[in-house]
């Protein structure tokens, strides 16, 4: 099939015809979170005829195949232009257009005795976005101290092993490796990737990143004392215990942070990367089910990042995955017979030094 592209200068100018013989490459990076996505367009400016874009110009990029049609990848606001030579060329760099405006303005705000869902609703409302929060978490107190909504929500999401992003007019806070959404905000099902779909792949494990559990401290409002909270990993009892060096305001908050740190450690114990012919349906945070590579590698993998590369030589999609539940079970080794820890973790007394 023949790869094709479309670049539109919003609101309604199609630049594709004038760029057909000048396009050197399109590179689009898609990562989990609010600040990682990026567009790079390299153009042949051999005669100096390519005009510099206006400040704040927005481009809509679509990729696809002549035989099956185009797929919209996203809208980007150009915030960097680079010219070089010889040979003379121009590179345009941009970020998702949804990230512009008030969401980058610094603010001061505080929340008490609420939920993460309510915080997301407040932030979405003042940025004229629709809130979607799939993380259930109680909030004792949160302080936004001269931070942008973008930075603040990214920080809070990480504490709950979640990601925050804006797509299709929606402010999304979703569990890591959980429910991916398309550019229009629709939930995406697990995508099956067979060995014959893949051009090349690489799998690696790292037991040094395994954790036997995570401990932290919390304040007990009833006793006024500090307690040490441990969230163990029954599948890795011999691995070292990690520590979150911040005293939480409650056992629930401490348990949530410890669980988030434990899940992050689990994802880093195995990685899978692969490249395949260009596909627009592969996006960060989507879960792929890989089949036909080999036992121990096959299974469900949450996508950490995707790079779409389009040039005169073709269109290629590069994918990086972190360990999902399937890989954690396979790499954990022999079980110890311990039951899964429920609730917010074990309270250890007296609190030790962290």
Show where each model-derived region lies.
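Conserved "cap/hinge" positions at secondary-structure junctions
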Residues: 63-65, 175, 286, 292
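Extracytoplasmic/secreted envelope proteins and their assembly/folding machinery
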Residues: 75, 117-120, 150-154, 213-214, ...
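Short, compositionally biased
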Residues: 75-84, 109, 177-180, 301-313
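Acidic/histidine-rich, surface-exposed loop or edge segments in extracytoplasmic proteins
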Residues: 100-105
């Amino acid at each position: 099939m023949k790869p094709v592209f479309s670049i539109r200068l919003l609101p309604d100018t199609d630049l594709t015809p004038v760029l057909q013989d000048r396009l050197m490459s399109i590179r689009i990076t898609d990562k989990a979170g609010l600040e990682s996505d990026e567009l790079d367009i390299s153009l042949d400016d051999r005669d100096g005829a390519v005009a510099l874009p206006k400040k704040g110009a927005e481009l809509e990029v679509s990729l696809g195949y002549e035989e099956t049609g185009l797929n919209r990848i996203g809208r980007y606001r150009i915030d960097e232009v680079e010219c070089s030579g010889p040979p003379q060329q121009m590179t345009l760099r941009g970020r998702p257009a949804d990230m512009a405006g008030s969401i980058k303005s610094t603010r001061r705000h505080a929340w008490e005795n609420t939920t993460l869902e309510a915080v997301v609703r407040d932030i979405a409302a003042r940025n004229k976005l629709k809130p979607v929060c799939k993380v259930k978490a109680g909030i004792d107190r949160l302080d936004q101290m001269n931070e942008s909504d973008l930075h603040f929500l990214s920080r809070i999401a990480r504490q709950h092993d979640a990601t925050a992003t804006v797509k299709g007019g929606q402010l999304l806070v979703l569990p890591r490796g959980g429910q991916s959404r398309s550019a229009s905000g629709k939930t995406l099902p697990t995508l099956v990737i067979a060995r014959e779909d893949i051009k090349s792949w690489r799998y690696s494990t790292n037991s040094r990143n395994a954790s036997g559990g995570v401990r932290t401290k919390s304040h007990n409002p009833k006793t006024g004392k500090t307690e040490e909270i441990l969230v163990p990993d029954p599948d890795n009892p011999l691995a070292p215990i990690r520590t979150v060096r911040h005293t939480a305001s409650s056992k629930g908050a401490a348990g949530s942070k410890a669980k988030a740190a434990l899940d992050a450690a689990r994802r880093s114990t195995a990685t899978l990367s692969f490249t395949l012919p260009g596909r627009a349906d592969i996006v960060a945070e989507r879960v792929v089910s890989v089949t036909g590579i080999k036992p121990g590698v096959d299974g469900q993998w949450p996508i950490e990042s995707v790079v779409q590369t389009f040039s005169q030589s073709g269109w290629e999609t590069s994918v990086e995955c972190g360990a999902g539940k399937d890989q954690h079970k396979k790499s954990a080794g022999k079980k110890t017979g311990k039951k899964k820890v429920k609730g917010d973790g074990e309270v250890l007394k007296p609190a030790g030094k962290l």
